[in-house]
Amino acid sequence: MRINMVRQLSISRAVSQPELLTRKGVSFLFLLFMVVLTAPNAMSSEFEVQIQSLTAVDRQYMTEQRKTVEGLANRLGRRVSGIAARDLDTLQEIIDRRWVDAEDVQTQQALGIVFGDLLAEELDFDWVIYRDKKGRSRALRYREEDIYVFPITLISRRLSAGAALSVESLFEEQLQKQRPKLPGARWMPN
């Protein structure tokens, strides 16, 4: 028995075997891919500062950080009281005793949170999330004004660099720097 094969009638390739990616298709996908990859960079150069309220996670994290400092203060027979003169002295004692290593960024930041709480109380600032093209930070903000302080960074950068740090001097420096920026500053006592 012999089988005769008959050739298929000629029809266009598009109908008989559609190609998934033609050169035009590959070029289009490459162009689309490049646009998607470069879009965030284009936007980041125009990225404006975004301010948000603290999230529940931020508040919980900051509470835990305060507990870390409270534990260090307890080793001195003290507690974090919210009274600037006492707490600044406590922070200074913790730093002077070198209880926080230069590599222990988390505890350094905990000290910055307590330091920030004292500034916030003195200047009537609130904790917010400050997001810019460099990243996300916890910062202090005066009401709805564009007046910010970054107390966590103020402390942690100095400690991680091993720089001498006078917490009280830094506190006074920030008060002197921020008070003139506040609305009604002309009438505020120094």
Located regions from the model:
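Solvent-exposed, acidic/flexible segments
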Residues: 104-108
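A recognition module on extended beta-rich or small alphabeta surfaces enriched in W/G with H and D/E
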Residues: 139-190
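N-terminal low-complexity, intrinsically disordered segments
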Residues: 47-103
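Boundary at the C-terminal end of the N-terminal hydrophobic targeting segment
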Residues: 42-44
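N-terminal secretory signal peptides that target proteins for export/translocation
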Residues: 1-22
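Amphipathic protein-protein interaction modules
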Residues: 109-158
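Sec-dependent N-terminal signal peptides
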Residues: 23-33
